């Protein structure tokens, strides 16, 4: 498949990359009107986005570093106002409906274990954006240690700054307090692509 060829290209062409794997986490519902805008004729109000964890191990000065890209804590992410409304609107039937709307394939913890990686061996986590993300489980906060005790968050400075001062229309898509209490030394702010 194309994915297998891409994986092999990463491993063959770049001697720094020593391991790469993607693992399905959860199929999350997303409004079709936002996902496809006007490019659809489907009457379905939702489309599914497959959240995957990408595990990359690479060498830096002959040391292997581990990066987890998109480690979604979907148990905490349901506090995002949009998803909170969606997951509670069916009352007593909500658990059944939620298992249909957002089927879970793996947790991040299961995915990392499948790769044979210990939590303390994770050096970095990162996301394409922080909306809908609660990263406290992974990095810890003032009250609770993180699941990945040595990991640092790689994030664009502009994204981090935006998350700390959301506009009213953005709040529906950001997890309340998703970055609250994270120690500054656990965050690496990036000014540009690396």
Language model feature labels by segment:
Residues 74, 131, 159:
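Catalytic metal-binding/acid-base residues of hydrolase active sites
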Residues 88-152:
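Active-site metal-binding motif and surrounding structural segment of the metallo-beta-lactamase
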């Amino acid at each position: 498949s194309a994915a297998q060829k891409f994986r092999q290209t990463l491993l063959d062409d770049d001697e720094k990359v020593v391991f790469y794997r993607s693992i399905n986490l959860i199929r999350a519902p997303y409004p079709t009107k936002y996902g496809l805008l006007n490019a659809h004729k489907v009457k379905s109000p939702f489309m599914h986005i497959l959240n995957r964890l990408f595990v990359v191990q690479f060498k830096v000065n002959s040391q292997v570093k581990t990066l987890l890209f998109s480690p979604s804590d979907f148990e905490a992410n349901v506090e995002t106002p949009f998803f909170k409304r969606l997951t509670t609107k069916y009352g007593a039937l909500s658990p059944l409906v939620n298992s249909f709307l957002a089927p879970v394939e793996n947790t991040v913890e299961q995915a990392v274990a499948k790769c044979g990686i210990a939590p303390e061996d994770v050096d970095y986590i990162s996301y394409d954006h922080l909306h809908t993300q609660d990263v406290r489980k992974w990095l810890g906060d003032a009250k609770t240690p993180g699941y990945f005790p040595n990991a640092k968050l790689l994030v664009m400075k502009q994204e981090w700054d935006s998350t700390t001062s959301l506009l009213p229309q953005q709040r529906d898509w950001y997890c309340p307090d998703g970055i609250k209490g994270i120690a500054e030394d656990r965050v690496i702010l990036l000014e540009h692509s690396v």
